[in-house]
UniProtKB/Swiss-Prot annotation:
Keywords: ANK repeat, Calcium, Calcium channel, Calcium transport, Calmodulin-binding, Cell membrane, Disease variant, Glycoprotein, Ion channel, Ion transport, Membrane, Metal-binding, Phosphoprotein, Repeat, Transmembrane, Transmembrane helix, Transport
Organism (species): Homo sapiens
Intramembrane positions: 566-585
Protein name according to UniProt: Transient receptor potential cation channel subfamily V member 6
Region (Interaction with S100A10): 638-642
UniProt lineage: Eukaryota, Metazoa, Chordata, Craniata, Vertebrata
């Protein structure tokens, strides 16, 4: 061993420097150095910059960015390895060279607190590479290293305990806790935030790290040493919230149960599973928003109460807390329809959400929605009749152009309401204006409550239709103002209002399963396929219109006037593109030679290529929407039901379900669901499972117990063993098909609403 070298001295040789990735493998973009802004030509900008110079400097910095995320990550990894090689202490900690560490620590000049490129100490490196012996030597020499966090922006706040926990190094965790390592340290670096740039999200505390890697022993050990199971990270997420976001659903459910077993909440503390994050989401609501059906069903099992089991029938009470939109401003139903995650819509097909939505829609939602549609249809007819019979009078002034063929003009306000017919029209106009005001009073508060982006951008909520109806209401009010001041040109807002008002009738198609998905299909085609097609069409029209204008620029406009001036050339090319008109042909004169070549190319590109491209794009959109039409229609029904429930008074929309107060279940509301399972099908499943597991070499001993426990109507029955003659006479492949077929069949749910309204009839889903 040579003498101790400085930071720039040679490192201990012979060590393997193959890069080992740290626990979190996503690196942030390094901050740009704060240097004086430079002009692109290399000149410094003045200190007191104006608005234009400031914007120009920002544009230059944005344009001159050279480092990508991947490049930045690679550079920091290489820099970290280089720094380790340059430091004998860090290299010895990486290689678990105890002898070298002991020799280095004897020197007075040895800086035991020196840090690497990521702000890590030697103890962090030893924990990262699972070097227990090196970590013990470092902790004996400098016990304060246990409390030292990393200081880089990427891993800020991470201690050696975080690293040991995520690597599941139980011995090192025990050693760190024995030296009073902080169990409440928070790793707040950018690598630990929930971001699309990060591959993992384990929270900030060591306990959440241990829970996410499914280490029950470390979780118990941390809790015994005082780890707070109610600790929240910078997003307000507890360890239960973080478990909801993990990809391994099975382990997450097991760890969820373990953590709840340590929840010893008193009268002044809220239960752990009801603690919301900063967005107001409990773990249950977060599971619904994320579309985590496994965790959602797991949590629903904890909320249900089985009343009785009668053969294949099972009566179950499901707790509607946090699910029902009645009395909850942020219910699960509203969260699902407002989220952008498609997976969240799968929750609408889960029990009891599906049964609750169906009950509300068929009892209250559908009748009220049909009534609202009928009222709107009568309203728009009234507005149309008022527009058709608007006050007009013969034209009084003289014509100023031979092309002017106007015969009638708008009456003044004093002349518009003089006859009995005008009084009838006035009533219709008042109804129209009052209706427009009501529309604005209903729509505008929702914009502020939900936000502009969510309100207008969500297709399920009817975003484009909200734009139509609000614009229609404004056009009606503009028409009213122009009528009051006797301004000419009221036909412009009136025409827009008629088109928008009648187009909004399509919104009420969502009440029908056959027509509802088609409204979404139209929206996707208009704002998706058609918008992209319009950009291509604009490029083609601009190019060919310019060419046609140049070709006919020297010709007589009286003979070939389609492309005489440039605006006319653009409009004529647009008509040619849509095949509204044919190409200009006058056989009495000679056409330019380049016209034939240009028109042939235009016909091939526009008619044969681009129009068929649009048809293909729309066909693909139709295919995608058709495959999820049931899911989309169910989401539309939920959105419509929640909207009507919030708008209508409680006397017109009573709360659905059973109040638990009358039955000793507290103030919560429940929904009773009867599940029916075919007894023969259950037996076939057990036989098929027996054949499937009998031929397997690695038979799980617990599978028989799980199969028996999974049968709710006969838990005491043992697994039937098939006879040898039957097993030899039937192919195992047929049994496998039978097993798969039976498992794919969905159960039928029945809701008995007799406890709600005193009736004895059943409501079948």
């Amino acid at each position: 061993m040579g003498p101790l070298q400085g930071d720039g001295g040679p490192a201990l040789g012979g060590a393997d420097v193959a890069p080992r990735l740290s626990p979190v493998r996503v690196w942030p973009r390094p901050q740009a150095p704060k240097e004086p802004a430079l002009h692109p030509m290399g000149l410094s900008l003045p200190k007191e910059k104006g608005l234009i110079l400031c914007l120009w400097s920002k544009f230059c910095r944005w344009f001159q960015r050279r480092e990508s995320w991947a490049q930045s990550r690679d550079e920091q990894n290489l820099l970290q390895q280089k720094r380790i090689w340059e430091s004998p202490l860090l290299l010895a900690a990486k290689d678990n060279d105890v002898q070298a560490l002991n020799k280095l620590l004897k020197y007075e000049d040895c800086k035991v607190h020196q840090r690497g490129a990521m702000g890590e100490t030697a103890l962090h490196i030893a924990a990262l590479y699972d070097n227990l012996e090196a970590a013990m030597v470092l902790m004996e020499a400098a016990p304060e290293l246990v409390f030292e966090p990393m200081t880089s922006e990427l891993y800020e706040g991470q201690t050696a305990l975080h690293i040991a926990v995520v690597n599941q190094n139980m011995n090192l965790v025990r050693a760190l806790l024995a030296r009073r390592a902080s169990v409440s340290a928070r790793a707040t670096g950018t690598a630990f935030r929930r971001s699309p740039c990060n591959l993992i999200y384990f929270g900030e505390h060591p306990l959440s790290f241990a829970a996410c890697v499914n280490s029950e022993e470390i979780v118990r050990l941390l809790i015994e040493h005082g780890a707070d199971i109610r600790a929240q990270d910078s997003l307000g997420n507890t360890v239960l919230h973080i478990l909801i976001l993990q990809p391994n659903k099975t382990f997450a459910c097991q760890m969820y149960n373990l953590l709840l077993s340590y929840d010893r909440h008193g009268d002044h503390l809220q239960p752990l599973d009801l603690v919301p994050n900063h967005q107001g989401l409990t773990p249950f609501k977060l599971a619904g928003v994320e579309g985590n059906t496994v965790m959602f069903q797991h949590l629903m099992q904890k909320r249900k109460h089985t009343q009785w089991t009668y053969g294949p029938l099972t009566s179950t009470l499901y707790d509607l807390t946090e699910i029902d939109s009645s009395g909850d401003e942020q219910s699960l139903l509203e969260l699902i329809i407002t989220t952008k995650k498609r997976e969240a819509r799968q929750i609408l097909d889960q029990t009891p959400v599906k049964e609750l939505v169906s009950l509300k829609w068929k009892r209250y939602g559908r009748p009220y929605f049909c009534m609202l549609g009928a009222i709107y249809l009568l309203y728009i007819i009234c507005f149309t009749m008022c527009c058709i019979y608007r006050p007009l009078k013969p034209r009084t002034n003289n014509r100023t152009s031979p092309r002017d063929n106007t015969l009638l003009q708008q009456k003044l306000l004093q002349e518009a309401y003089m006859t009995p017919k005008d009084d009838i029209r006035l009533v219709g106009e008042l109804v129209t204006v009052i209706g427009a005001i009501i529309i604005l009073l209903v729509e505008v508060p929702d914009i502020f409550r939900m936000g502009v982006t969510r309100f207008f951008g969500q297709t399920i909520l009817g975003g484009p239709f909200h734009v139509l109806i609000i614009t229609y209401a404004f056009m009606v009010l503009v028409t009213m103002v122009m009528r009051l001041i006797s301004a000419s040109g009221e036909v412009v807002p009136m025409s827009f209002a008629l088109v928008l008002g009648w187009c909004n009738v399509m919104y009420f198609a969502r009440g029908f399963q056959m027509l509802g998905p088609f409204t979404i299909m139209i929206q996707k085609m208009i704002f998706g396929d058609l918008m992209r097609f319009c950009w291509l069409m604009a490029v083609v029209i601009l190019g060919f219109a310019s060419a046609f204008y140049i070709i006919f620029q020297t010709e007589d406009p009286e003979e070939l006037g389609h492309f005489y001036d440039y605006p006319m050339a653009l409009f004529s090319t647009f008509e040619l593109f849509l095949t509204i008109i044919d190409g200009p042909a006058n056989y009495n004169v000679d056409l330019p030679f380049m016209y034939s070549i240009t028109y042939a190319a235009f016909a091939i590109i526009a008619t044969l290529l681009m129009l068929n491209l649009l048809i293909a794009m729309m066909g693909d959109t139709h295919w995608r929407v058709a495959h999820e039409r049931d899911e989309l229609w169910r989401a539309q029904i939920v959105a419509t039901t929640v909207m009507l429930e919030r708008k209508l008074p409680r006397c017109l929309w009573p709360r659905s379900g059973i109040c638990g107060r009358e039955y000793g279940l507290g103030d919560r509301w429940f929904l009773r669901v009867e599940d029916r399972q075919d007894l023969n099908r259950q037996r076939i499943q057990r036989y098929a499972q027996a054949f499937h597991t009998r031929g397997s070499e690695d038979l799980d001993k617990d599978s028989v117990e799980k199969l028996e426990l999974g049968c709710p109507f006969s838990p005491h029955l043992s697994l039937p063993m098939p006879s040898v003659s039957r097993s030899t006479s039937r192919s195992s492949a047929n049994w496998e098909r039978l097993r798969q077929g039976t498992l794919r069949r969905d159960l039928r749910g029945i809701i008995n609403r007799g406890l709600e309204d005193g009736e004895s009839w059943e409501y079948q889903i």
